[in-house]
Each structure stands twice: as structure tokens, then as C-alpha cells.
Amino acid sequence: MPVARNGTIIPIDDQPISAGFFGEGQWLTDFVTPNALEVKTLYKDICKGKQTRRERVVGMHQFVGAAIKYRPFIGATMTVAGKTSRNPDAWLPPSITRMVGIGNCANKAFLLASLLRNEFSPKEVHVVLGNLYNGKAGGHAWCQLQMDDRSYIIESTRADVPTFISTDTTERYEAVHFFNDIDAYAIAGRTAMEPYLACYSTWLKDYLDMSYIRGRR
């Protein structure tokens, strides 16, 4: 179960997302992929020779923060048999992010959470979607880890910050959603949950698969 500094965490339906190409729908939990071949190989490479969990977590954070270049938006194009789909802010599978070496905050958090899930249980690792207050509020994604009876924020966009940032002492990060490859949660009252075929979050409106939500598929 994730941890929130303020607010009540509630379980929610998996969210239908369309953030790739050709309007393809995917579930929110599909973006954390601990069993992908590239993720498993990368996990083994990063953790080789590291004796403690703490060392391995630092290694994973350092890799994603430094080796995967950060850009606020990732424009991507897919062409299949002459048909082309363009997405100005694509959510990519962790394996693709690893291979291309570039990602937005969400893509980097998906990859880091997928790596961490090779070390920790679903109860201990979540991607967090929320707001970062840095002069003004902006949407952001990061990871949360429960380890040694403490909860930590792990900032996946940067390697030049401490790996372990205590959830209890950080006010700049405001969580709205938590998820991994198994389940999804929200902070009660921070998003409107609208019931259609699925009970969807209006906070995610820019990435939702509205065709599915409105029953057109």
C-alpha cells in the first residue's frame, strides 16, 4: 500500500489510457513492466556486484536519472504500412525508453518502477502521478518506495539529487495517483472520479482512452 503525507488513499479502477499511437488503448498498470526482457537484463547489469538493497536502489536511480535523458515532452511517430500516427507527448513502454535513452518524467518513472519491482513487492513500489510545486504547480511523475519501514520519494528525472527523499518531510510533491503493474490508487478528493464503463479520473483527462470510456469499443 502506498503512503501519503496528507490525504486518504483509496483503491481505484485501472484507468484506460490512450497515450501511444493509432488510438490504441492500454491500462494504466500496463506501463510498469518488471518482466520485460530488457528491464530484467538492465536490472541484472545495474545490480551486479552490489551487495545491499540500498546500493542496488541507488544504482537504479543513478542509471535512470543520468543515462536516460530528460525532456518535458516526448514527441514520437509510428508508421505501419504507410499509415502514420504522431503523438506530441507519448507514454512509452519502459523497454523502449531504455533503448532510445530519452524520456519525459512519466517514461522515466515507468522505467525506474519496473526496475525496482525486480527487487521489491507490489506493495512497496509505485509510480506516482501528481503535482510538483517549484515556484508554481506542475504535473509530474516520480516513484515511491517503502523500504525498511520508511517511505521514500525517488526522483527519476535527476541523478544529482539524493536517492532517498523522505515522504514525511517533503511538501513539494503532491500525489494524486499511485500505481504499479498490479493495482492503482488515488488520494480521495484530489480528482473527480466519473463513472462510465470504468470509473475514470478527470485528472488524467489528457491521456484517457475516451472511446473506451464512452463505450465505443
Role assignments for model-derived ranges:
Residues 1-217:
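A structural boundary/capping signal
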